[in-house]
């Protein structure tokens, strides 16, 4: 460094990378975890921002569907059962989380068509 320039102005406040990117998820923490996790020798500046955005989007999507499931069950609090219903009823999320077990999630209500009672036609006289 040659020492040129005035550096940072005295009155300016530091701005987090999350707020710069317009995200709620912590970009700095994700960057640290990527560096410490030995995933690669070096981590680019854009990688943690992109990853934080993806994680935030997926979280928002699941919470939106789980909130709808809670409302359908006339509950105001999301429980693991609502998360399970949200994920398993959504085709893409179910594919993404196919190998994931949600604790206390239960199972989807499903009765095989063969086991359902036969529909008999009423005879008209």
Swiss-Prot record:
- Provide the alphabetized UniProt keywords: Acetylation, Chromosome, DNA-binding, Methylation, Nucleosome core, Nucleus
Q: Region entry Disordered: which residue ranges?
A: 1-23
Grouped into one coarse class, the protein's main location is nucleus
Q: Does the keyword Flavoprotein apply?
A: no
- Residues the record lists as N5-methylglutamine modifications: 104
Q: SUPFAM superfamilies under this entry?
A: Histone-fold (SSF47113)
Q: Which cysteines are joined by disulfide bonds?
A: none
Spell out which residues are annotated as carrying N-acetylserine: 2
Gene Ontology MF annotations: DNA binding; protein heterodimerization activity; structural constituent of chromatin
User: Under the cellular component aspect of Gene Ontology, which terms does the record hold?
Assistant: nucleosome; nucleus
UniProt-listed Pfam families: Histone, Histone_H2A_C
Show the Gene3D superfamilies listed in the entry: Histone, subunit A
Lineage, top-rank taxon, reads: Eukaryota
* Stated family: Belongs to the histone H2A family.
What is known about what this protein does? Core component of nucleosome. Nucleosomes wrap and compact DNA into chromatin, limiting DNA accessibility to the cellular machineries which require DNA as a template. Histones thereby play a central role in transcription regulation, DNA repair, DNA replication and chromosomal stability. DNA accessibility is regulated via a complex set of post-translational modifications of histones, also called histone code, and nucleosome remodeling.
What is this protein's record name?
A: Histone H2A
Q: Please name the source species.
A: Acropora formosa (Staghorn coral)
């Amino acid at each position: 460094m040659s020492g040129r320039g005035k550096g940072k102005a005295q009155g300016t406040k530091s701005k987090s990378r999350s707020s710069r990117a317009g995200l709620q998820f912590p970009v700095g923490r994700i960057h640290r975890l990527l560096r410490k996790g030995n995933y690669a020798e070096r981590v680019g500046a854009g990688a943690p921002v992109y990853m934080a955005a993806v994680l935030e989007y997926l979280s928002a999507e699941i919470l939106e569907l789980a909130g709808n499931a809670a409302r359908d069950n006339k509950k105001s609090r999301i429980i693991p059962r609502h998360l399970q219903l949200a994920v398993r009823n959504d085709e893409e999320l179910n594919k993404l989380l196919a190998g994931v077990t949600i604790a206390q999630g239960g199972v989807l209500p499903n009765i095989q068509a063969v086991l359902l009672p036969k529909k008999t036609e009423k005879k008209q006289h």
